């Protein structure tokens, strides 16, 4: 079960507390997030990933729902894009955004999803110039990719000169005031900032929080559903013994008006 923290007005907190005190906790029941995960026809590889990533709990924090316009930033094969497509429904729209590097790393596996999902559009764009209208998004997802903005490799397809400040400024431009940003990433040790982004592919949680707050976003919620206290936060995330076993932070921000 996720440990969820949301900022609610005092009156709503009082009502919630009274409800639990009088009636007890509500029995678990399926909602649109569970329904999205249970949707027929999802690829087998996605179902295996569900056991590690707990997508219903993560997406529930975002509040994404029918008719919304959502971007999945550096979506790779589009695992989350497909789930969001079910949440927003036929009147909503999902942008599956990759740059050339993420298209290459995903081996273009997003193509099958786009063919099946009429409300999902794939775009290959530079991360500093997303090509979307200003204030056009109800929500944006950054799932285990934010740390890459601070990675400056000497070789490979990832751009060597990405300006993280410019990318976050662009993200703030396209998310409408009041819109939501859902952030998930691999935890680095506290106080390390972005130092481990290029080596371990991790980033410090509080550094991430300050980064988004400095670009016009307010933290409004968090979840411990992907926490792994046994992770020493000293090993690389995408290969070796830590694959699927990393401590990950989950935060949701709201674009300030």
Residue ranges with predicted function:
Residues 85-86, 158-177:
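A short glycine-rich, Lys/Arg-flanked "PGG" loop and its adjoining helix->strand segment in the class I
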Residues 33-61, 65:
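Class I SAM-dependent methyltransferase Rossmann-like catalytic core
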Residues 130-140:
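A short acidic, Gly/Pro-enriched loop at the edge of an enzyme's catalytic core
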Residues 138-162:
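A short SAM/SAH-binding and catalytic strip from SAM-dependent methyltransferases
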